[in-house]
Amino acid sequence: MSQKKKASHPAINLMAGGTAGLFEALCCHPLDTIKVRMQIYRRVAGIEHVKPPGFIKTGRTIYQKEGFLALYKGLGAVVIGIIPKMAIRFSSYEFYRTLLVNKESGIVSTGNTFVAGVGAGITEAVLVVNPMEVVKIRLQAQHLTPSEPNAGPKYNNAIHAAYTIVKEEGVSALYRGVSLTAARQATNQGANFTVYSKLKEFLQNYHQMDVLPSWETSCIGLISGAIGPFSNAPLDTIKTRLQKDKSISLEKQSGMKKIITIGAQLLKEEGFRALYKGITPRVMRVAPGQAVTFTVYEYVREHLENLGIFKKNDTPKPKPLK
């Protein structure tokens, strides 16, 4: 059963994770574009009754005015960062679990599984996710937002956007909002890995098999992926505004003061519900994304192991949490 499962070779984790991330991006990136547009929407000045558009209307507007490919704006930045992101996520998660395993029983408790997930989320946020998202959000936000109706495209692609941001604003601009990104990724991955591990263990024991059917893996990935967005939606909304906003007044403030300023401005101008703006497409983006990620990851890893190209690590994985 799962207690006897051998650890995969690091190269297998890298290849399986990268492939899973690529499929996730291709399948779910349009939902992320809609989510970002909803979060950065500004009410039209002087017209109180104008409400921010909803998920379907936002997606339809993007498609009608900018074309189908506009839904994939910023995809280049995601694809460029997806392989190291997934490699860091899965490898760091396994590394932290190894540190937290009970040396006598070989068991990782539920609490320590959550801590390992939190550590993996923080690690990926600092090394990959934040710079990638700054570039992605700039690309997604540069066309036809209500507050900038006549603005032309400033960035041609992900590489050009990254170069322009660093040239005009410095390397530190790529880490704008990193504390919020780290907090978001930490809660996401903590909940994600904990729920996924528990559900996977339950189904493995129920079926008396190590390899679950793909549809079951998708279901538990969907469930685990849906939890995080509800707990940290305000952080994600503030982070998106912070990474898009380049105002001089904000540049003079400390990181925490920027967060407080943007949060207070959101509450004052748009109300409490603005902190949860984009929650629907975010759940629709993250939950199916995790379903795709875990399903593809498990599938590719199993097939790479069966090919026998890489030798498995002889050290067993920590026993499932009890």
UniProtKB/Swiss-Prot annotation:
Transmembrane regions: 11-31, 68-88, 114-134, 177-193, 219-235, 278-295
A single cellular component GO annotation: mitochondrial inner membrane
A GO biological-process term: succinate transport
Family matches, as Pfam families: Mito_carr
Membrane topology according to the record: Multi-pass membrane protein
Disulfide pairings: none
Gene Ontology terms for molecular function: succinate:fumarate antiporter activity
Primary role: Transports cytoplasmic succinate, derived from isocitrate by the action of isocitrate lyase in the cytosol, into the mitochondrial matrix in exchange for fumarate.
Protein known as: Succinate/fumarate mitochondrial transporter
Organism: Saccharomyces cerevisiae (strain ATCC 204508 / S288c)
